[in-house]
Amino acid sequence: MKKILVIRMSAIGDIVLATSFLESVKQKYPDSEIHFLIKKEFSDIVKKHPIIDKLISFDKKLGLNELFRLGKFLRSNNYDIIFDIHSVFRTRVLSLFLRKNLFKQIKKPRLRRFLLFYGYKNYFEESFSHIKMYHTLLGQDKTFPQTNLYIDQLEEDKTKQFLREDNIGNNYIAIVPGAAWSQKQWSIDNYNNLIKKLIRSFNSTIVILGSTNDVICDKIIKHDKIINLKDKTSLRMAMGVVKYAQHTLGSDTGLSHISEAMGTPVTMILGPTSKETGARVTLSDSRVIENKDLWCRPCSQNGSRPCYRKEQYCMTEIDSEKVYSNVSRALTL
């Protein structure tokens, strides 16, 4: 039996996309034992994943000593193959502890991204995706498995009970207004206008999801049909909430990618990021809303770069009516 290590330490969206690669690794090596290396703060995402035989977490707060300890530990596991689908400084340090001929690392399009962000020249092929990039390590470039995450029966039961206690039925839309970087957030006015239209047209319950830092959630209008769960769910519970939603709406953020991996289509509003940075949907019923005609986007890998124009047109030119028409079509499929 082969022992295989897959490395993807962060961030939430990229870890979700990595589950497609895990499926392919298992298909290619059906009798293998698969270990997955991830940052400690993200480990809950792939907990209970049936393909992962062992989850190894890394605590970056412990610094280089922890990295060296981890490298020695990985070496002692005697892996037959190591797939590094992250390719950052930390994973290169880890590679020093592992046999070079067994270590397979993705080649990131760093030069193309630099030219895109700072020279405004797009040399990416139309079909580029992070999932496709990961699969180059397996020699695959055509069709790829869908991303998948899992919660167990106990978690499903707890989610259903939690929804009942908040009087949330089956007819609800999950909205994730926050993002790691404010530049990726759609405006609160647009969210509130959209929510009013959805309630008026579909009588849907709107469930707001977010963490402590997502202050935009506090600015959502109050209404009998709006249930604001900001900071009231664990990540695992939020996974259950999006699983049972009719639809999920948000920007290029972790819970949007999680929603698709749980089988719920999303409408993803893209501003400073794009498919060239890994922001794209995977389900056929999901939608991307973006302004493709702007010369300045995408402007950074994760949306962290402050906008240098007088207005952030990639977001301000997407109005609530455009998003509403896309969501309403998705709800009536």
Predicted regions and their residues:
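Catalytic machinery of carbohydrate-active enzymes
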Residues: 1-333
